[in-house]
């Protein structure tokens, strides 16, 4: 059985994503969790507590249990030679968040929903374990980079072409095949091919990726159905604030 999880960082984007998922997909059983660093700001704790009431529960994860240091942050700060986390050494994310999430998941096939907005050009820090698949519901492209690279790889071209012919409406066959049959070059690389397919039809693209994933061991491919493939929402900063305010959780 495939698990669905969503990490609550205490930031606005992950909080809004949790509310969005609960409201838009009420039949999807999502395990919400928070990785406690022991050094959160008071307003962060207030937001998480309000969110917990709205969601009906958040599992609290805490790294470095049994450490003589008063908080997980101080434990890993000392272990790193008192070097604070930085863009080059993100031990806070790796040790206190990703590692704890991976322990929480274990070896179960799991879909992890990540709150990166549609107006952000980044992938975020996600697990590389093969049983954990990241999904980005706020973006036009909900799939992770590794999935896109597989899907658009020249070695899978015939398989993907065949899948598209199965899921594609007749009026979109020609423009989609034109994109698919255009070889990857320095001027027409993965991201351009991806955006060209998304611009034709997001939902058809998602259906094609989903059918492709059924031929792999990735978690989404193990599902009998995946409702997010019919979603073409793109949420940006203003939408995040609206979700938080309209829910009553607040910002």
Where is each model-derived feature located?
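Nucleotide-activated chemistry modules centered on ATP-dependent adenylation/adenylyltransferase
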Residues: 1-251
């Amino acid at each position: 059985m495939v698990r669905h999880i969503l990490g609550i960082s205490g930031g606005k984007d992950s909080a809004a994503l949790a509310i969005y998922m609960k409201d838009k997909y009420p039949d999807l059983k999502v395990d919400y969790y928070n990785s406690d660093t022991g050094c959160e700001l008071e307003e962060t704790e207030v937001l998480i507590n309000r969110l917990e009431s709205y969601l009906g529960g958040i599992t609290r994860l805490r790294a470095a249990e049994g450490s003589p240091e008063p908080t997980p942050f101080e434990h890993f700060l000392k272990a790193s030679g008192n070097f604070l986390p930085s863009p080059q050494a993100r031990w806070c994310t790796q040790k206190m968040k990703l590692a704890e999430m991976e322990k929480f998941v274990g070896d179960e096939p799991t879909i992890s929903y990540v709150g990166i907005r549609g107006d952000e050009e980044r992938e975020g820090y996600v697990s590389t374990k093969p049983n954990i698949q990241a999904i980005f519901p706020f973006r036009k492209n909900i799939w992770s980079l590794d999935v896109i690279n597989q899907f658009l790889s020249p070695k899978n071209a015939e398989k993907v072409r065949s899948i598209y012919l199965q899921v594609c409406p007749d009026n979109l066959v020609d423009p989609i095949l034109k994109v698919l049959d255009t070889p990857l070059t320095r001027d027409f690389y993965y991201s351009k091919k991806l955006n060209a397919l998304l611009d034709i039809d997001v939902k058809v693209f998602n259906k094609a990726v989903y059918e492709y994933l059924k031929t792999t061991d990735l978690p989404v491919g193990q599902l009998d159905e995946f409702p997010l493939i019919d979603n073409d929402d793109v949420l940006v900063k203003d939408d995040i604030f609206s979700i938080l305010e309209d829910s009553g959780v607040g910002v």
